Design a protein with these regions (language model features):
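C-terminal cap of thioredoxin/glutaredoxin-like
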Residues: 1-73, 79-84, 97-104, 184-285
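Active-site oxyanion-binding pockets that recognize sulfate/phosphate
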Residues: 2, 87, 125
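Structured beta->alpha junctions
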Residues: 34, 89, 156-157
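Glycine-/small-residue-rich active-site loops that bind phosphorylated ligands and cofactors
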Residues: 37-38, 92-93, 160
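Surface-exposed loop/turn and secondary-structure junction residues enriched for glycine/proline
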Residues: 40, 46, 92, 120-121, ...
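Short active-site neighborhood of thiol/selenol oxidoreductases, capturing the structured segment around
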Residues: 77-93, 112
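Structural alpha/beta surface segment adjacent to cysteine/selenocysteine redox centers
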Residues: 95-189, 277-284
Length: 285
């Protein structure tokens, strides 16, 4: 077939303009009647919507592309596996999967290392209004599927709140409260709409995490967090991941078994854990 470069360029331009008009920022997306679907990972939302309209010919309620289940067992690790979790404190996706990630580690017995990174816009990655709007609406759909009461009240923690929390993180981690500090920050920002940019908001985060606010205040302006957070970013990039949350599952030799990006990939990590433990059990019998 003969290709007309000028016609192709015009077609691409028109399509990009239409996509922007409909409220999205990226390609390879599905759009149906006012709602966007990010590739095959979101088709189950579309399937459910079409089923509600009675559009499925066989009247079956079985999905073609269901959201894969996050399996929490039955096998349990005994010191062989390590899961590295890369969250950020401004990420809606991080906020809906943070507790599930901790639960997976606890129930399977794997070692969990939380490696926070700066939010993308604080790393110099540009973000459009369309992108921000889509991410919030998509995270709300995903949270509903996970049966999480999320996003009814949100107070964007961009900037100083994130830096303040990261400034406290090394101290909190040494106190055995690092996970709790991050969790409470996300809870306040994305579940309760608390202004973490206020003294009272940050004080609430700290005290909910089981830490002393008087001690915390003296650590807010220490710079020890910066090399740690930057190292985490570089490590994440080395895995071929750029966004959050990202995951790396490795064995006792430090070899990467799975490295992946997205809250909608925790199911993959969970299955990789069970597959590894099953193979190890079989080889030892």
């Amino acid at each position: 077939y003969k290709i007309d470069p000028e016609a192709s360029e015009k077609k691409i331009k028109r399509s990009n303009e239409l996509r922007k008009q409909l409220g999205h920022y990226s390609g390879a997306m599905f759009y149906y009647a006012g709602e966007w679907y990010w590739g095959i990972d979101r088709l189950y939302h579309l399937e459910k919507r079409l089923m509600e309209l009675g559009a499925n010919k066989d009247q079956s309620d079985t999905l073609i592309c269901p959201r894969p289940e996050i399996v929490m067992g039955p096998l349990k690790d005994s010191g062989n596996l390590k899961l590295r979790f890369f969250p950020s404190l401004r990420s809606p996706y991080t906020s809906i999967i943070f507790d599930k990630t901790l639960e997976l580690a606890e129930k399977t017995g794997i070692e969990l290392e939380i490696s926070p990174v700066l939010p993308m816009v604080m790393r110099g990655v540009p973000a459009t209004m369309q992108k921000g709007s889509y991410i919030m609406s998509d995270a709300a759909r995903e949270a509903k599927e996970l049966k999480i009461d999320w996003g009814k009240r949100v107070y964007d923690p961009i900037g100083e709140p994130v830096i303040n929390c990261y400034a406290l993180y090394p101290w909190a981690k040494r106190s055995g409260k690092g996970d709790a500090l991050l969790r409470e920050f996300l809870q306040c920002a994305f579940y309760e709409g608390i202004n973490t940019n206020s003294t009272s908001g940050m004080k609430l985060v700290v005290e909910r995490a089981g830490l002393d606010w008087v001690q915390a205040k003296s650590r807010l302006y220490l710079g020890e967090w910066e090399p740690l957070i930057e190292k985490n970013r570089l490590d994440m990039y080395d895995l071929g991941c750029w966004g959050v949350p990202s995951y790396e599952l490795s064995d006792s030799e430090g070899e990467t078994l799975v490295a992946t990006w997205g809250q909608d990939r925790l199911w993959l990590i969970s299955r990789a854990i069970q597959n590894y433990l099953k193979e190890s059990k079989t080889s030892n019998e």
